[in-house]
Regions:
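Short, acidic/polar
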Residues: 2-12, 141-147
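Cys-nucleophile CN-hydrolase/nitrilase-fold catalytic domain and related Cys-dependent amidase chemistry
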Residues: 5-92, 98, 164-186
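Short hydrophobic-aromatic micro-motifs
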Residues: 22, 131-136, 158, 188-189
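Short beta->alpha transition motifs characteristic of CBS
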Residues: 30, 37, 89, 99-105, ...
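CN hydrolase (nitrilase-like) catalytic-core segments centered on the catalytic cysteine
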Residues: 45-64, 140-234
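Active-site catalytic loop in hydrolytic enzyme cores
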Residues: 54, 73-152, 165-175, 179, ...
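Short beta-strand scaffold segments in enzyme catalytic cores
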Residues: 65-67, 86-90, 123-125, 214-216, ...
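Short, basic/aromatic-enriched C-terminal tail that caps enzymatic domains
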Residues: 235-257
């Protein structure tokens, strides 16, 4: 698909510039308005995930990218609905897994749970000497998930996102990404789908189709990098020692036994 080819090209570009962990947005495989999700959903053994994983293996990097996997079938209002999981694919050398979004986006007159089965499990993985936790989009409104990931050892939390635009939504996004970094004393790497229509549509209600403004926030809530409404690639050096230092001076996270 076109999305897949764009994703592969961006991964290759980022890896060529030295990236070790590459984070793409929620719904990288296809956006929420590209047709019925259940008709496009693929397993982790399907062509989208295996193409990402093959390139990650070749480049010796770890990639996180949003996709949809078949989940369950429910009956609602006399209709049979094949729901999907909103999955953050995690792919790298010898690694092929995923995190299923726990908090479905049932807000602002939208009900993701009608078509998406909520996940149940926290997920963390290693990249070099870094422990990375996973969350997706609406999860960022739930600080306990981020604190629990940090208590389990996560030093950085990735957040693939397709953040709906509208009045105040960019301000909320900026506040929430900084707040979750402070709550968890972790780096936050939040990759958002770019805004359809770019700056010209900024602030107009859009549904879950992206607001751009991908960002990297350090454990002290300082924004290290931020994109605009358009496509971009952000880079940052991640220092585990900065996490350790912050957690010594601001001990708000209790390590799990």
């Amino acid at each position: 698909t076109e999305n897949q080819e764009i994703a592969l090209a961006k991964i290759r570009e980022a890896a060529g510039n030295g990236a070790r962990l590459i984070v793409l947005p929620e719904a990288t495989s296809q956006n929420f308005r590209s047709g019925r999700l259940d008709e496009q959903a693929q397993s982790l053994e399907g062509p989208f995930a295996t193409a990402i994983q093959a390139l990650a293996e070749e480049l010796e990097v770890t990639v996180v990218a949003g996709m949809f996997c078949p989940a369950d079938t429910v009956e609602r209002d006399g209709k049979t609905i094949n729901r999907v999981s909103n999955t953050a694919l995690i792919a790298g050398p010898g690694v092929l897994g995923g995190y299923d979004k726990i908090h479905t986006y049932d807000a602002f007159d939208y009900r993701e749970s009608d078509t998406v089965l909520a996940g149940e499990s926290l997920v963390a993985f290693d990249v070099d000497d870094l422990v990375v936790g996973a969350a997706t989009c609406y999860d960022i409104r739930f600080p306990e998930q981020f604190k629990e990931l940090a208590s389990q050892g996560a030093q950085l939390i990735v957040v693939p996102t397709s953040w709906a635009d509208g009045p105040g939504k960019l301000e909320q996004w900026r506040l929430l990404t900084a707040a979750r970094a402070l709550d968890s004393t972790s780096y936050i790497v939040a990759a958002g789908q770019s805004r359809p229509g770019g700056d010209a549509e900024a602030g107009n209600p859009s549904g879950p189709t992206g607001i751009g403004h991908s960002t990297i926030v350090d454990p002290n809530g300082v924004r290290v990098a931020e994109a605009g409404y358009e496509d971009d690639i952000l880079y940052a050096e991640i220092d585990p020692n900065e996490v350790a230092k912050t957690r010594r001076t601001l001990p708000v996270v209790t390590p799990a036994d």
